[in-house]
Amino acid sequence: MDGFDVSQAPPEYRSVEPIANLFVLGMGLGWLINYVGMIYQSFKDETYGMAIMPLCCNIAWEIVYSLIYPSKSLTEQGVFIAGLTINIGVMYAAIKFAPKEWSHAPLVMRNLSLIFFLATLGFLTGHLALAAEIGHSLAYSWGAVVCQLLLSVGGLCQLLCRGCTRGASYTLWLSRFLGSSCTVGFASLRWMYWPESFSWLNSPLVLWSLALFLTVDGSYGICYWYVRQYELSLKEAEGRKSK
């Protein structure tokens, strides 16, 4: 049974499919808010909000599973295509403003467009290779796991390396967390009510990935708060000096 084809789902899953679709819509809403917010924040702060490698991996995954191996669920199709369309804007903003973040590394700064292109091409072929190796139904989920872990770890590392909240906000963090948590929600329903195709979601590696996502994304919120407080303390100190 192809776990990607909802029309072949057992009656148990079909009975909870409307709830699963709500989680899919929640996933889409969270990520669309995140993408639009990143475009806004990028132009506001003249930087990029998502680390380069996670961004390239993410847009490559969306290309593969929006255009090459589209879901047979119309809800998922709509969410993925909408996400890909807006993510192109995220990529444009990143390419436009990334040179300002790499003035300390001229070789990188002068070749960022090429780096974005090659990284996206590399991840695109990687997602396709994974689909050819284990089938696109499984590769869809495992590729998404890789994207999520890169996003979580890359986002936290970027925040700590910059030492400031430039290109970030609570809205971006919470919308990303909402979108990913909804993904966990509908995956859980598939595992519980469609075990013939999704029993593997209870595997140690999936559970480890889930624990890592929750730990790192939860840590991001705490670290963001500390960095923001540090920024505010510096601003207050400068204000007192100017008096």
Curated annotation (Swiss-Prot):
One of its GO terms (molecular function) is lyase activity. Keywords: Glycoprotein, Lyase, Membrane, Transmembrane, Transmembrane helix. It is an enzyme of class 4 (lyase). InterPro entries: PaxB-like. The keyword Disulfide bond does not apply. Pathway: Secondary metabolite biosynthesis. The chain crosses the membrane at residues 19-39, 48-68, 78-98, 112-132, 137-157, 172-194, 205-225. One of its GO terms (cellular component) is membrane. It is found in: Membrane. It is a multi-pass membrane protein. Its main location: membrane. Its EC number is 4.2.3.-. The keyword Lyase applies. Glycans are attached at N111. Terpene cyclase; part of the gene cluster that mediates the biosynthesis of the indole diterpenes penitrems. The geranylgeranyl diphosphate (GGPP) synthase ptmG catalyzes the first step in penitrem biosynthesis via conversion of farnesyl pyrophosphate and isopentyl pyrophosphate into geranylgeranyl pyrophosphate (GGPP). Condensation of indole-3-glycerol phosphate with GGPP by the prenyl transferase ptmC then forms 3-geranylgeranylindole (3-GGI). Belongs to the paxB family. This is Terpene cyclase ptmB.
